[in-house]
């Protein structure tokens, strides 16, 4: 049975959230968080950080008021629509990202919340540990996580939207997908635990599109 759920909320500000997702979805997203908390599920809220939501600490306070006790955040991953010039212009530098995260960690500690930063290679290990964050992220593509797109396409991780899927869960045998050459190659790189995002670094045939 379902016991946990993660919801992406870009901002406590409806206008910012809606602008970043390209739809008027803020109210439905917040309602979903409330419903999941009320149902007794373990709820985490993830926020990809960019120049439009540098007040992330306020978003942490907002989701705490909704009953959320665990939050994660990440850099803006260059995949799908985030590869465009307009999106690239909103990406934070390492220094900016560190400042945003440090302020949010302070709020999370004040409220007794747990927080993790999940983008491998974006911030140095010593930077994360200096904030008291114990999770040093590594890429889990095809290793600890994969994702299924709405059309059934199987992708290495939830952000890997730029290249052809590894297969389709509706029409292809799972073992064939899992043991395919592409899947195995991505998994082998993830297993090195190099604290690098394969989408940022480029990985074999993916380098031309990621």
Predicted region positions:
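Radical SAM enzyme [4Fe-4S]-AdoMet core and its adjacent flexible, acidic
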Residues: 3-4, 8-140, 145, 150-154, ...
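Flexible mid-to-C-terminal extensions adjoining Fe-S/redox cofactors in radical SAM and related proteins
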Residues: 129-130, 136, 153-210
